């Protein structure tokens, strides 16, 4: 993926706490990888309307089936959202 100002959404099914933690981890990882990114923490309900405007949506692997498979955004599912290495590996696959 070209290093433009990427729009990434950290989506959480249960409130905003987890998505905010993911957002912080994703911002750190993207900076380490040399990417510029605007990262938002959103609920699943808020994310549903943004599948065609975001570049990447990252969420729990259990939620990925809820997204439109034809969406513009690349959907990234992570089993352990607190594992920074797993998040980094998952993002690296779509960048």
Swiss-Prot record:
It is an enzyme of class 2 (transferase). It catalyses: N(pros)-phospho-L-histidyl-[protein] + L-ascorbate(out) = L-ascorbate 6-phosphate(in) + L-histidyl-[protein]. The modification Phosphocysteine is found at residue 12. One of its GO terms (molecular function) is protein-N(PI)-phosphohistidine-sugar phosphotransferase activity. The phosphoenolpyruvate-dependent sugar phosphotransferase system (sugar PTS), a major carbohydrate active transport system, catalyzes the phosphorylation of incoming sugar substrates concomitantly with their translocation across the cell membrane. The enzyme II UlaABC PTS system is involved in ascorbate transport. The active site is at 12 (phosphocysteine intermediate). Its EC number is 2.7.1.194. GO terms for cellular component: cytoplasm. This is Ascorbate-specific PTS system EIIB component. The PTS EIIB type-2 domain is phosphorylated by phospho-EIIA on a cysteinyl residue. Then, it transfers the phosphoryl group to the sugar substrate concomitantly with the sugar uptake processed by the PTS EIIC type-2 domain. Keywords: Cytoplasm, Kinase, Phosphoprotein, Phosphotransferase system, Transferase, Transport. It comes from Mycoplasma pneumoniae (strain ATCC 29342 / M129 / Subtype 1) (Mycoplasmoides pneumoniae). CDD domains: PTS_IIB_ascorbate. It is found in: Cytoplasm. Pfam families: PTS_IIB. InterPro entries: PTS_EIIB-like_sf (IPR036095), PTS_EIIB_2 (IPR013011), PTS_EIIB_2/3 (IPR003501). Residues 1-95 form the PTS EIIB type-2 domain. One of its GO terms (biological process) is phosphoenolpyruvate-dependent sugar phosphotransferase system.
């Amino acid at each position: 993926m070209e290093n433009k100002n990427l729009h990434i959404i950290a989506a959480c099914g249960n409130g905003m706490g987890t998505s905010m933690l993911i957002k912080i981890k994703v911002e750190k990882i993207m900076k380490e990888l040399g990417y510029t990114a605007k990262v938002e923490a959103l609920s699943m309900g808020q994310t549903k309307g943004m599948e065609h405007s975001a570049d990447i949506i990252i969420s729990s692997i259990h939620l990925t089936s809820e997204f439109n498979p034809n969406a513009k955004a690349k959907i990234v599912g992570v089993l352990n959202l607190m594992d920074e290495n797993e998040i980094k590996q998952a993002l690296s696959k779509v960048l």
